[in-house]
From Swiss-Prot:
Source species: Histophilus somni (Haemophilus somnus)
Family according to the record: Belongs to the GST superfamily. HSP26 family.
A Pfam family matched in the record: GST_C
Name of the protein in its database record: Stringent starvation protein A homolog
Gene designation per UniProt: sspA
GST C-terminal domain sequence ranges: 92-212
UniProt cross-references to SUPFAM superfamilies, sorted A to Z: GST C-terminal domain-like (SSF47616), Thioredoxin-like (SSF52833)
Length: 212
């Protein structure tokens, strides 16, 4: 593992451009203003380099000098500690615990449904997107209470929910009805952040507020 890591003089992220977990990490790297190299991974043919670094061959995998990390949450928390400004986790332990629980719930409750929408049949996609839309509309008041997701500052929790909402938009979901304005305002605010724009590359988010 060390020999493969030592070949790299700059922080390197092994990623798949469409993977949601890689997207999370790219947002954090952009928020922190970290210079890094990328290596695109072909899921059909994992490179020997990646297998040497990460025995699971999973992405994202981050190499920082002699350190190799995998699992997006581990990577993001490492980056937040390694580059403390701007902070992406709350200061107090209770708030940190609540944030970690929120991230876990988004990952366990919503990400699998999104995966069904992205990889399933047409009917499975419709059912999955309807479920996601209804569940997010059900918590719409949360989006109106603060600038970001349950916080006045952009946090790691936003790095979980923003890629989900982005993918829903790309799949044609439009929030309408009660609570939709707050959700769309949140999406507009997050999608226009420099870090998010960097994380999606050349894709430009459309103006969500056109669809009131």
């Amino acid at each position: 593992m060390t020999s493969a890591a030592n070949k790299r003089s700059i922080m390197t992220l092994f990623l798949d451009k469409v993977d949601i977990y890689c997207h999370q990490v790219r947002i954090v790297l952009a928020e922190k203003g970290v210079a890094y190299a990328t290596e695109i991974v072909d899921s059909e043919s994992i490179s020997e380099d990646l297998m040497e670094l990460n025995p699971y061959g999973t992405i994202p995998t981050l190499v920082d000098r002699d350190l190799v990390l995998f699992n997006s949450r581990i990577i993001m928390e490492y980056l937040d500690e390694r580059f403390p400004h701007p902070p992406l986790m709350p200061v107090y332990p209770v708030s940190r615990g609540k944030s970690r629980l929120l991230m876990l719930r988004i990952e366990q409750d919503w990400y699998p449904v999104l995966e069904k929408a992205e990889k399933g049949s047409e009917s499975e996609r419709a059912i999955a997107l309807k479920q996601l839309k209804e569940e997010i509309l059900a918590i719409a008041p949360v989006f109106s209470q603060s600038l970001y997701f349950m916080s006045e500052e952009f946090r790691l929790v936003d790095c979980y929910i923003a890629p989900l909402l982005w993918r829903m938009q790309q799949l044609g979901v439009v929030f309408t009805g009660t609570g939709s304005k707050a959700i769309k305002s949140y999406m507009e605010r997050v999608f226009q952040r420099d870090s998010f724009l960097q994380s999606v590359g050349e894709m430009t988010p459309k103006n969500l507020m056109e669809d009131k």
